[in-house]
């Protein structure tokens, strides 16, 4: 029985040595998902912060709901809104 144990240990030793010595082949379909995930999270974080800064800067306004700011030049003289503005400024 002792010889069977020795043979078993010898075979296991040979298998581990053969596995350790085999050169690692480069598999083109092995991807590094951890660096891909970290890169995606960094880009998502940058875009999120950029979006918050754009919203807080108030530079991006909707054109259909934008009120005329004071001090801006009037619209064209032929429009109805500009004629009302001219009349309202004369009364002041």
From Swiss-Prot:
Function as written in the Swiss-Prot or TrEMBL entry: Associates with and regulates the activity of the sodium/potassium-transporting ATPase (NKA) which transports Na(+) out of the cell and K(+) into the cell. Inhibits NKA activity in its unphosphorylated state and stimulates activity when phosphorylated. Reduces glutathionylation of the NKA beta-1 subunit ATP1B1, thus reversing glutathionylation-mediated inhibition of ATP1B1. Contributes to female sexual development by maintaining the excitability of neurons which secrete gonadotropin-releasing hormone.
InterPro entries named in the record: FXYD_motif (IPR047297), Ion-transport_regulator_FXYD (IPR000272), PLM (IPR047281)
Regions of this protein lying in the Extracellular compartment: 21-35
Range of residues in the leader sequence: 1-20
Residues anchoring lipid (S-palmitoyl cysteine): 60, 62
Similarity field: Belongs to the FXYD family.
Example of a GO biological process term: muscle contraction
Subcellular location: Cell membrane, Sarcolemma; Apical cell membrane; Membrane, Caveola; Cell membrane, Sarcolemma, T-tubule
Phosphothreonine modification, residue list: 79, 89
CDD domains attached to this UniProt entry: FXYD1
Protein name as it appears in the record: Phospholemman
Record membrane topology: Single-pass type I membrane protein
PTM text: Major plasma membrane substrate for cAMP-dependent protein kinase (PKA) and protein kinase C (PKC) in several different tissues. Phosphorylated in response to insulin and adrenergic stimulation. Phosphorylation at Ser-88 stimulates sodium/potassium-transporting ATPase activity while the unphosphorylated form inhibits sodium/potassium-transporting ATPase activity. Phosphorylation increases tetramerization, decreases binding to ATP1A1 and reduces inhibition of ATP1A1 activity. Phosphorylation at Ser-83 leads to greatly reduced interaction with ATP1A1, ATP1A2 and ATP1A3.
Transmembrane residue ranges: 36-56
Positions of post-translational S-glutathionyl cysteine modification: 62
Domain of life per record: Eukaryota
Species in which this protein is naturally found: Homo sapiens (Human)
GO molecular function, one term: sodium channel regulator activity
Domain notes: The cytoplasmic domain is sufficient to regulate sodium/potassium-transporting ATPase activity.
Gene for this chain: FXYD1
């Amino acid at each position: 029985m002792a010889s069977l144990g020795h043979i078993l240990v010898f075979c296991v030793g040979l298998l581990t040595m053969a596995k350790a010595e085999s050169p690692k082949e480069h598999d083109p379909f092995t991807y590094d998902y951890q660096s891909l995930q970290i890169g995606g999270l960094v880009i998502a974080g940058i875009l999120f912060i950029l979006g918050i800064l754009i919203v807080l800067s108030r530079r991006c306004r909707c054109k259909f709901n934008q009120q005329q700011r004071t001090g801006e030049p009037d619209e064209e003289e032929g429009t109805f809104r500009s004629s009302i503005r001219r009349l309202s400024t004369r009364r002041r």
